[in-house]
UniProtKB/Swiss-Prot annotation:
GO MF annotations in UniProt: ATP binding; pantoate-beta-alanine ligase activity
This protein's pathway: Cofactor biosynthesis; (R)-pantothenate biosynthesis; (R)-pantothenate from (R)-pantoate and beta-alanine: step 1/1
Binding-site positions, beta-alanine: Q61
InterPro entries in alphabetical order: Cyt_trans-like, Pantoate_ligase, Pantoate_ligase_C, Rossmann-like_a/b/a_fold
List of residues binding (R)-pantoate: Q61, Q153
Full protein name: Pantothenate synthetase
GO CC terms in record: cytosol
SUPFAM superfamilies listed in its UniProt record: Nucleotidylyl transferase (SSF52374)
UniProt-annotated location(s): Cytoplasm
Species this protein is from: Desulfotalea psychrophila (strain LSv54 / DSM 12343)
Family: Belongs to the pantothenate synthetase family.
Disulfide bonds: none
Length: 286
């Protein structure tokens, strides 16, 4: 595995591959790999001739008071795992390499980022869209692989690819969960034992919602989204938390759906502690 930290070098490497007619997959990450990340890397290895994993903690997607400084950075461990899974290039630029001293450009995908996580994290998705755009330009991938846990981010990136005419395919991979159902996240490392147990309320709320929807559907009844949200909210309240949001939306437009329809997704966010905010989502009717 080759480690590259400069924009010029990654461009040169990709150009060599392209001249050989090789396809390229990109897995953008902020590091601190868990099994969810590794599933993305494995998928990239399966579908392309060459695989780039980017490892960059992107400062412009963190808001004031968020965990940029505390965000875990186990670089050596991440590097070893990427190499073990057959990564060809680990692209690990410094912040000053990605963003020059006079950097002024901001990419914004407006409508898709207005609600859900976007409502409580102003500027976050602009930061994600900007760094992803730069990575797409630098790495010129044929495929880019993202996880479905960051449901709103995935929808935004798909729209970004359409709007900016990127010649690449977005591949999504399912949420990777712990044995007890908790969606894997780099921020799970922050949880103490009590918080870790209570954090199960996210996946439990989704299961309660799905069970309710399936029962109503089997009975041939209309399923009001507000009823389902109330059921899910009760699970989170019982765990001692107030959800930041719970919403049932169209999986492509992210528009709220007044009644549950096939393909709708329930997405939710809960702040477990001051700097520990977890998200999860699930389709309700397939």
């Amino acid at each position: 595995m080759k480690k590259i930290s400069s924009r010029q070098e990654i461009r040169e490497q990709v150009k060599k591959w392209q001249e050989q007619g090789l396809t390229v997959a990109l897995v953008p990450t902020m590091g601190c790999f868990h099994q969810g990340h590794l599933s993305l890397i494995k998928k990239g290895r399966e579908i392309a001739d060459r695989l780039i994993v980017s490892l960059f903690v992107n400062p412009i997607q963190f808001g004031p008071g968020e965990d940029l400084d505390a965000y875990p950075r186990p670089y050596e461990k991440d590097s070893r795992l990427a190499e073990e899974l057959g990564t060809d290039v680990l692209f690990c630029p410094e912040t000053t390499e990605m963003y020059g001293p006079n950097f002024q450009t901001n990419i914004s995908v407006t409508t898709l980022t207005a609600d859900l996580c976007g409502a409580g994290r102003p500027g976050h998705f602009d930061g994600v869209a900007t760094v992803v755009t730069k990575l797409f330009h630098l790495c010129q991938p044929d495929f880019a692989i993202f996880g479905e846990k960051d449901f709103q981010q995935l929808a935004m990136i798909k729209q970004l690819v359409i709007d900016l005419d990127f010649d690449l395919q977005i591949i999504s991979c399912p949420i990777y969960r712990e044995d007890d159902g908790l969606a894997m996240s780099s921020r799970n490392k922050y949880l103490n034992a009590e918080q870790r147990l209570k954090a199960l309320c996210l996946s439990q709320a989704l299961e309660v919602a799905k069970d309710y929807v399936l029962a109503r559907s089997a009975a041939g009844k209309t399923i009001e989204s507000d009823e389902v949200i109330t059921k899910a909210r009760g699970v989170i309240i019982d765990a001692g938390y107030e959800p930041e949001y719970i919403s049932i939306v169209d999986q492509q437009t992210l528009e709220p759906s007044p009644t549950v329809q096939p393909g709708n997704v329930m997405a939710l966010a809960v702040r477990i502690a001051e700097r520990i905010r977890l998200i999860d989502n699930s389709a309700l009717l397939t």
